[in-house]
């Protein structure tokens, strides 16, 4: 019985130690990303500098049940606000089109055109399967090494972190956040996404799934 208690005690110590390490990794990763993006994300038009190219990070247009996805809605509004204020000249809409029935990129372009953005100012990136793919393809595929990322603040910070570590000058324009009751799961996932971002940059050396074929980009003149 005493031997069993010793084994059980060691088992719980291992579990506790694992939880402590796991929590520390998440907190340190979050701090690392936050510091890397410090003073690189902006919430007002007046404060953000000009950058020729905006990069809208993709998300689904609608949520389950058919209602509009507020993350999508607010990102489109932020992109239009930037464009109309002359803070960007072109917009890359980068999203997932891995299956025929699901096309974030086309949905974003359609929404922006309906909101008054000229079609010739929008560039479609159909292979933005992840934040890393979208950010790195802006440079590797479209030749843009200076971008303004357009998403919610928590997402922008991770995108800026990724960009900074791949020699891309990136700012973030923070779209309106969604009410907390709708965004709890997304925010929780973001903590784990930041751990993955650090692994992608410093351990795995991850690159986009498709990035070797260059695509034309409009001339700024």
Task: Pin down the residues of each PLM region.
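N-terminal type II signal-anchor transmembrane helix
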Residues: 3-46
């Amino acid at each position: 019985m005493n031997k069993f208690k010793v084994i059980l005690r060691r088992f719980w110590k291992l579990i506790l130690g694992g939880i402590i390490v796991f929590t520390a990794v998440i907190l340190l990763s979050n701090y690392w990303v936050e510091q890397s993006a410090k003073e690189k994300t902006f919430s007002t038009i007046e404060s953000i500098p000009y950058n020729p190219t905006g990069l809208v990070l993709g998300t689904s247009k609608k949520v389950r049940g058919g209602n509009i996805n507020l993350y999508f809605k607010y990102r489109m509004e932020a992109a239009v606000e930037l464009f109309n204020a002359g803070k960007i000249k072109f917009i890359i809409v980068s999203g997932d089109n891995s299956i025929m029935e699901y096309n974030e990129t086309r949905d974003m372009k359609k929404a922006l055109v309906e909101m008054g953005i000229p079609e010739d100012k929008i560039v479609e990136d159909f292979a933005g399967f992840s934040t890393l793919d979208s950010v790195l393809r802006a440079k590797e595929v479209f030749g843009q090494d200076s971008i303004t990322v357009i998403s919610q603040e928590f997402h922008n910070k991770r995108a800026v972190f990724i960009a900074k570590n791949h020699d891309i000058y990136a700012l973030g324009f923070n779209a309106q956040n969604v009410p907390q009751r709708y965004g709890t799961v997304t925010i929780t996932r973001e903590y784990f996404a930041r751990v993955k971002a650090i692994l992608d940059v410093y351990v795995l050396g991850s690159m986009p799934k498709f990035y070797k074929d260059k695509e034309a980009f409009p001339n700024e003149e």
